Amino acid sequence: MKTPFSKMDGLGNQIIVADMRESTHALTPQAILSLAADSQTYFDQIMAIHLPTKKEADFRIEIWNADGSMANACGNGTRCVIAWLTDHNYGEIFRLETPAGIVEGKRQIDNLISVDMGCPNFNAKEMPVSREIIDTNHVELTAGPLRDACLVSIGNLHAIFFVENDIQYIPLEKYGSKLEHDPLFPQRCNISIACVTSQESLNLRTWERGAGLTQACGSAACASAVAAYRRGLTKRNIDVNLPGGTLNIFYREDDHIIMTGPVKYGFSGFLNPLTGSYKKDDF
């Protein structure tokens, strides 16, 4: 009962990529929580690779948060999957079936990984919110100094708060959980604070749904870039600076969002999908 896996790092976003294609057992809640609690395998998301169910996809991805809940999208995790598939010689360009739809990714010449995250959704009627919202560009939502959120769905829902001062001075660890569980969001929400530093860059911190305060969140970087452009604060192609590093986000004219950035490997090995026990590869 050996499932190959790699512990990876997407700008400080801790990711486990697990190849479940030949596994006869699904990941259990016990295994997920055990891996999350371990000092070496702790993660923000597990990206579980499965055989596709759609003919237009090469692989299917399940995404698990550290609290055992499932996610519809994970940008940095998707970049890690693309790197893993490339390094294991499965091809050069990949179409991945995710809960949010088909995403496409590839490794660039400079060794960075790019993923087409698809198109953002601003339609409140298609978002899991509990009340009618007329304009998702300006939503009444308050916690401390944070107010006037922009809601964007990148397959998962994000609330972005733009501030003029240094985002480090706002205790997101204090307000993040409160906003994540606000009654407006029956399925919870990712919460970010952003400060635009120029028409081509912004700084970002994110409280990730199901994971908490994180070093990086790829879908939040996409959502913040789109929200900033929508409010007329930035251009379409910008750098998003997160605590873990920088992602380039290109919001194309055709509405597709291209996210590009680095990934790193920690270690690889085999895990037991029932218990979460694991063994590292010997080098």
UniProtKB/Swiss-Prot annotation:
EC assignment: 5.1.1.7
Positions of substrate binding: 13, 45, 65, 75-76, 156, 190, 208-209, 218-219
Disulfide bonds: none
Keyword terms: Amino-acid biosynthesis, Cytoplasm, Isomerase, Lysine biosynthesis
Gene3D superfamilies, per the entry: Diaminopimelate Epimerase, Chain A, domain 1
Catalysed transformations (reactions): (2S,6S)-2,6-diaminopimelate = meso-2,6-diaminopimelate
Family annotation (InterPro entries): DAP_epimerase_AS, DAP_epimerase_DapF
GO terms classed as biological process: lysine biosynthetic process via diaminopimelate
Molecular function in Gene Ontology: diaminopimelate epimerase activity
Origin: domain of life: Bacteria
Catalytic residues identified in the record: 74, 217
NCBIfam families in UniProt: DapF
Protein family according to the UniProt entry: Belongs to the diaminopimelate epimerase family.
Quaternary structure and interacting proteins, as annotated: Homodimer.
UniProt-recorded name of the protein: Diaminopimelate epimerase
